[in-house]
Each structure stands twice: as C-alpha cells, then as structure tokens.
Amino acid sequence: VLDMIGSEHSPGHETNGGSFGQTISQAAGVAWARRRKKEKGLVWLFLSDGEFQEGQTWEALMSMAFHKISNLKIVVDVNGQQVDGKTCDVMNLEPLLEKISSFGACVKQVDGHDLVALNNAFRTIHQDKPLVVLAKTSPFRGMEILEKRYPFLHYVRFKDENENEEFKSFLNDMKLR
C-alpha cells in the first residue's frame, strides 16, 4: 500500500516529488546516475496522467530518450482525474500513448487493474529507451461510493453529517470483507 502522495517515510521511497511534474526528472537523474556508477537494479516511478500537463515531464522524457536511460520503468495511473476535475476538461492529453512514443519512450497501455497485464508490460524489452506503462484505471474501483463525487474526487469535504455517516458506514463495511 502506498501513501496517497508518497513521502520520505513511505516504504521504498528514496525521494518525494515536491511540486507537480518534478518526479520524472528526479527519477531520470537517479536512473542515469546509477547507470553511470554501473549499479544494477531499476528505478520505478509512479505518477498520474495529470502530470503530463507539465512541460518538465516532456523535457524529462526527451532527455531520457536522448541519454538512452533504460533502467527506469514508469507507471502512469491513467484515471482521467486530477484535483480540478477531469483531465480532459483541464487540458486534454490524448492521444497520450502516441505523444509519449513520439518523445522516444517505449509505451505500453494496459488495464491497470489487471496484474497479469501489468506484469507482462513490465517485462517488455525496451533497449536504450525508458519504459512507460499507461495503466488505465477507474478511480471508483472497489469504492463505488466515490462515483457520486465525480468529477471532483480529490480533497473534497463532506457536504453534511449524513454524507459523513454514509462514508463511515461504507468504510466499516469494507473492514468486514
């Protein structure tokens, strides 16, 4: 289980992201440095589709392709959501796969809820290129109660005590499963 926004106390996190869009540059730098030091192992990066609205994300992809950084695997949670609502309403990113490919990355798109598909995508040979796995997910999966909040799912306060109780009841029911 990962924190909503990982930080230095999260298991396996060597760094936290800081401002939106910076993690990809940090991960590229760590992967490049590890390769230069001849260290084995991979750098994994988890980010959201909304981060592709930041120019720094595209610059990092271009740099990774140029420097042939292939010890980096990037998983993008493509759930179409961000703090301000639907990503397509804030700034449409499609066709995301083609755009990322055009920057020199090896890109695979899978059902982000399918662990076998994810595992197969992670095994893709991507010599001299970073691997980007677009994991299409539903932000409601397993928590259909959130659907009525759509498209605003981040940092939303309860409207009233009834809604608060409804969520408490839902969470208590989840503990029984």
Predicted regions located by residue number:
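Acidic, glycine-rich active-site loops and adjacent beta-strand->loop/helix elements
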Residues: 47-54, 78-82, 114-115, 139
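Conserved thiamine diphosphate
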Residues: 38-40, 88-121, 175
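A short, conserved beta-to-alpha structural element at the edge of catalytic cores
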Residues: 67-92, 96, 103
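A short alpha/beta connector and helix-capping loop motif
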Residues: 54-79, 132-135
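Generic beta-sheet signal
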Residues: 41-45, 72, 127-135
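Cofactor-binding active-site loop characterized by glycine-rich and histidine/acidic residues
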Residues: 1-66
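Short acidic, glycine/serine/threonine-rich loops at helix termini
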Residues: 56-58, 84-88, 143-148
